[in-house]
Amino acid sequence: MKEIIEKLAKFENLSGVEMTDVIERIVTGRVTEAQIASLLLALKMKGETPEERTAIARVMRGHAQHIPTEIHDAMDNCGTGGDKSFSFNISTTAAFVLAGGGIHMAKHGNRSISSKSGSADVLEALGINLDLKPAELGKVFDKTGIVFLFAKNMHPAMKYIMPARLELGIPTIMNLTGPLIHPMALETQLLGISRPELLESTAQVLKNMGRKRAIVVAGPEGLDEAGLNGTTKIALLENGEISLSSFTPEDLGMEGYAMEDIRGGNAQENAEILLSVLKNEASPFLETTVLNAGLGFYANGKIDSIKEGVALARQVIARGKALEKLRLLQEYQK
């Protein structure tokens, strides 16, 4: 382990084999907490390569829980977090809109590390049981078309890494890894990151992980979602090719809002915001959700443009389909 950390300290990249070996040792309890923290910091300072990120993702997925389900076209819209925006739970709210639009959503998420309320926190406040067994979660998914997978329970091996992450309290390669290690074999994905310089490389990792179609999104002001406060950049993975583009609210015929307009609060406050959006109450929260759900519909390939996706998202919310999915999840995942 010492040699690996010294190599990273010299800003030398690790091979896929080296990274695989290191992570296998970590997730089987053979590395100290201090060494894990040093590794995470060294990787962050050097900059993580697609090869390193793919290796760690494959190891972590290999140690994940298996969710038995009859659904084979699941999608997730989990982001990396760590953007310090303190926004409401955008992707969690958008997940219900996507599910209401007919997409099988297996929302993967965790408690907050660097914000006030993570996806697990807000859903727990809404009465969702975070601790169902994998077989029970599979049944929920089959019945409702939506399920929440609590990352802490899905990845028991993460217990070896979590203390170092919490002690560091800053985004690391594990933030970048979380959305890549979904327990299910996803076909499509919308993945938000707070570092736009990693758009293309993250799309490459998704390709390596077998995604058929995906979008990696980096919003304005470091937001790990699409934003109405400036230019949003995306990388689209389609037919094995990666293309980069960007858009503004004006491009989509939408009104712009400042970051402070979408600030959230604690889990209970964010739960109230989520409910207000699904009830179609006009606000910057609603508009931001519509934007991100629209991007999700496009990432899934359900429609042919982000603008069409935004229109579909509005219809789904207005018809009560998104709220209906929340009520279903509250009924079955309890």
From Swiss-Prot:
Anthranilate 2 binds at R165. GO terms for biological process: L-tryptophan biosynthetic process. It catalyses: N-(5-phospho-beta-D-ribosyl)anthranilate + diphosphate = 5-phospho-alpha-D-ribose 1-diphosphate + anthranilate. Pathway: Amino-acid biosynthesis; L-tryptophan biosynthesis; L-tryptophan from chorismate: step 2/5. Keywords: Amino-acid biosynthesis, Aromatic amino acid biosynthesis, Glycosyltransferase, Magnesium, Metal-binding, Transferase, Tryptophan biosynthesis. GO terms for molecular function: anthranilate phosphoribosyltransferase activity; magnesium ion binding. Gene3D superfamilies: Nucleoside phosphorylase/phosphoribosyltransferase catalytic domain (3.40.1030.10), Transferase, Pyrimidine Nucleoside Phosphorylase, Chain C (1.20.970.10). Its EC number is 2.4.2.18. Mg(2+) 1 binds at S91, E225. SUPFAM superfamilies: Nucleoside phosphorylase/phosphoribosyltransferase catalytic domain, Nucleoside phosphorylase/phosphoribosyltransferase N-terminal domain. It comes from the Bacteria. Mg(2+) 2 binds at D224, E225. Its cofactor is Mg(2+). Pfam families: Glycos_trans_3N, Glycos_transf_3. Anthranilate 1 binds at G79, N110. Binds 2 magnesium ions per monomer. 5-phospho-alpha-D-ribose 1-diphosphate binds at residues 79, 82-83, 87, 89-92, 107-115, 119. GO terms for cellular component: cytosol. Catalyzes the transfer of the phosphoribosyl group of 5-phosphorylribose-1-pyrophosphate (PRPP) to anthranilate to yield N-(5'-phosphoribosyl)-anthranilate (PRA). Homodimer. Belongs to the anthranilate phosphoribosyltransferase family. This is Anthranilate phosphoribosyltransferase. The lineage of its organism: Bacteria, Bacillati, Bacillota, Bacilli, Lactobacillales.
